[in-house]
Structure formats: C-alpha cells, structure tokens
Amino acid sequence: VTRQDLIVCSFYTPDNYYSSHAKALRAELDRLGIDHELLEIKKAPGEDWADTTRRKIGFIKSVCDKNPTKKVFWVDIDCRINYLPDYIANSTADLIGFQRSFGSPLQIGYGNRTRFWEPSFWGLGTSPQAR
C-alpha cells in the first residue's frame, strides 16, 4: 500500500555510481510503498558537484508544486531507507531534518561545524509557510 500523504524526491547524474544508487533507492521506496520522484539530471559543461547540488532547492520546489497536499522529503540518492519512522512521516512540522552527523544537541559542537543541518535528509510540510 502506497502512502498517499508524502513523497520522497532526489536527483542523480547518469554516471554508474549515482545511477546504481538511484536504482537501489527506487527499489527500497517501492518496497516500503513510498511514492517518489527520482530524476536523472544532466550536468552542464563545466558544472561541478557544488553547482549540481545548488539545483536541489529548485527541484524540491517543483516537487512541492506538483504535490501540494503531500509532505515532501529530500533524500540524497546514495542514502538508504530501511523504514520511515512514524515520528517523521506523521510530523506536522513545516520543516523537519536532522542536525549535522545525526548527533544530539550536546554532541554537535557548534564551533566545529560549518553547517547545522544534515543535508542528506530533510522534509517540508504542506502548510503555506512550508511551501
């Protein structure tokens, strides 16, 4: 049974590394009954990894626009999902994510980190504020 209230999205480049991870993630999401949009993208000439990752926000916005009643979760294509915990899937938050390295607030060491959020998994709710 597919959950109708959420969708997982990601994109990947067509090289062997990322396309094989896309295939594995797609299979996991299908097994879990989680709707998904996994998009193959082409890198522009001269585009590097940082340029490619900057396309993430526009892509997520397009998934939100196409799915206004669904929570939208971004998962890096080379991540694995064994299950989606209820406290995440059923969250009513506008924005949900994990802090860097998935640590507790006492372990993060803000002075040692350049970013608070772990960019590999985060989600948006369906409220106007979230979108």
Each model region followed by its residue ranges:
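N-terminal anchoring/stem segment of glycosyltransferases
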Residues: V1-K70, T126-P128
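Flexible, glycine-/basic-rich loop-and-beta segments that form/coincide
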Residues: R131
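Residue-level detector of short, conserved catalytic/binding motifs and their immediate flanks
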Residues: L6, P119-S120
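GT-A fold catalytic core of metal-dependent nucleotide-sugar glycosyltransferases
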Residues: R54-T114, F121-S127
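Short, flexible turn/loop "capping" segments at secondary-structure junctions
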Residues: T2, R113-F116
